[in-house]
Amino acid sequence: MVRQAKGDGKAHTVQDSIPFRNIFPDGLCRLDGGDFSKTIAYEDVNYRLAGPEDQRSIFESLCDFYNGYDPTIGVQMTLSSRYVEHGPEEDLFGIRPQGDDLDPIRKDAAGILRFQYERGSNGYVKTKYVTLTIEAENLAAARARFARIETDTLNRFKVMGAAAHVLDGKERLELLHGILHPEGGRFAFDWDWLAPSGLSVKDFIAPSSFHFGETRTFRIGEMYGAVSFLQITAPEIHDRILSEFMETEGNILVTMHIRGINQNEAIKMVKRKITDLDAMKIAEQKRAVRSGYDMDILPSDLATYGGAAKTILQDLQSRNERMFNLTFLVMHMAATKQKLEIAVSQAASVAQTYNCLLTRLDFQQEDGLMSSLPLGLNRIKIERSLTTSALAVFVPFVTQELFMGGESMYYGLNALSNNLILLDRKQSRCPNGLVFGTPGSGKSMSCKREITFIILTTKDNVIICDPEDEYSPLVKRLGGQVIRLSPSSTDYVNPLDINLNYSDEENPLALKSDFVLSFCELIMGSKTGLEAIEKTVIDRAVQKIYQPYFADPRPENMPILGDLMEALLAQGIPEADRVAQALDLYVNGSLNFFNHRTTVDIRNRLVCFDIKGLGKNLKKPGMLIVQDAVWNTVTINRAIGRSTWYFVDEFHLLLKEEQTAAYSAEIWKRFRKWGGVPTGATQNPKDLLSSPEIENILENSDFIYMLNQAAGDRKILAERLGISAEQLAYVTNSEPGHGLLFFNNVILPFADDFPKDTELYKLLTTKPSEVEHAAETET
């Protein structure tokens, strides 16, 4: 039978139990009485692996954070770890069957991501919030005061390096819905629905039922829950206690209600405590004299408490310390009572490790649940007074996460949190990338993995410069085009290919002429470069040989090196003859491999230039020609709005020669504007420090994937990227596929261990024994 509400002050519906009056579109929440609250979400920062100085800086900033709130502002810190049910792996990672030959690879890739996802802790979404509560006469007064408080709070998070934003009304409702629906369920809400339906915002977040019939547990729908409080009995608290609570299994919500005490009242309170302790000390001394004992022998607790109280008084009077009251709550949710007890026991073990006690609330489970909601309401009056420094030891930071939306791709697991690292490099200010690692550390495999996911999850083009013929099996399996450049090959690429979009200037010949100058300089082998007259005759010849093509842009009108040589000879001056004679070896001589029109399809989405077969004399111009072919493709794709990824293995080979190094620096400088995403893989970072021009490649790379590093290279990376000694441990004698990721100034340790019993792993691996075994299996 439904009981009617008769003004008895009790909650008669689930909605009545949720302790707020209303939430407004701007995120302002009206509580009972004259209290109002707002919630701010903030991101994690790299604390655990930061150096001692950086950790100290974060700690001091956290002290300033708490000191910035006067006693009229309530502060509620909320740390949530909640399991979110996902659909099939293709829904989560965007890898869907297409009904073609790549579906087995797609299934492998999706399965591997699902394996890594479940192996890590990504089923659990970890979020952090601070809810601020004030008292105000009305909505207008509350909004006016919160305007200043929000700005100050966001600035304090910025100082700590944590991104933060104020939740609007819908975001707050979604947050509450997630907590009140621990079994999952989609949140659907729109402000326009309220008036026609006659419903309140509570109707969109309320669970099916609350049950508070038991003394130490409660139920939300079919889920079981329990709220405990932390008894801080340890003389000192470790800064990892919060993070270890959040690393326990199961749905957990850690709440810290913090309220500052007026400084004068705090000092008076401590002085009264000292006076009481002194009175107890005098009483003990009198008792000792009467009993014939030494009056200096006092109970140890009395001496300890007296010294601690005087230290606190000194901190309050002469240091930047304030006093706060803290209520520390831990709420668990589980599908069964047994799972709930296991989760609570795990958290209790963490508390015991740090000499604290996690005690279940008796007969206060409803108040505990409502106090755990990020509303800024605290009904549990179990408080512990702490100074600013003691409070700030509860550091809410562990490690930053990289879990982006859009066309994000997998780059391993965060070695600290076990969460997937999903990035969309194209969202970066500068998506250029570098991969560093000693031989056998996994450089090529990491590039292959990224290439695979680009092909499977985007519509972008990929071009590979492959000096060691390591990528051909993967490229063929993914339906790509392998172009073998060697004197014995019939795969020809014309170095003089051009398209009308070759430059963003009106005249595309300007940039093409620059390439031809670099090519001629390379084959002439002059240490001092081309002379001014030589540059003039080359440019004059370039202008002439492209006239037929621009007049009638058909493939058969595209010039080749032989046409360039003839145009030089036709000028009849010694400087032109000298350049023509240098070209003769590449036109009529034994190195005439590049004196042909292009015979291969470089319009395929995936193209691999295999340059292993180019001899010593052809490899240098060959690498330059590949770079120019890449530029051609990038300009074509830019016109149709498609990105082009360019992977260069053994990148140091390009950096050795002045011409290819200069061309590489130009690519790293200009590719972003043209929709290009270059990535260079090499062993040693010092290869990029040989000149200021090459050094710009490192400066212009916001994605750096660091595998195992030699000692000298570790030092270079630490200085250049600001890597701490603790972080460097992840690139010191690390296993293959393990290291550090630098992305947009975020540095994360990662682990990328692929299951080996898959077709995809066999395509990615570069270990000789595994490659041979895969080849034998295919035959």
Task: Place the predicted regions along the sequence by residue.
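Extended, folded cores of ATP/NTP-driven motor/assembly subunits in large transport
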Residues: 1-399
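P-loop NTPase motor domains
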Residues: 45, 52-71, 78, 82, ...
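Hydrophobic anchor at the beta1->P-loop junction of P-loop NTPases
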Residues: 435
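P-loop (Walker A) phosphate-binding loop of NTP-binding proteins
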Residues: 438
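Walker A/P-loop NTP-binding active-site region of P-loop NTPases
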Residues: 441-494
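Conserved AAA+ ATPase "SRH/arginine-finger" region at the nucleotide-binding site
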Residues: 483-488, 703-712
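H-loop/switch region of ABC-family ATPase nucleotide-binding domains
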Residues: 682
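Conserved P-loop NTPase
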Residues: 721-777
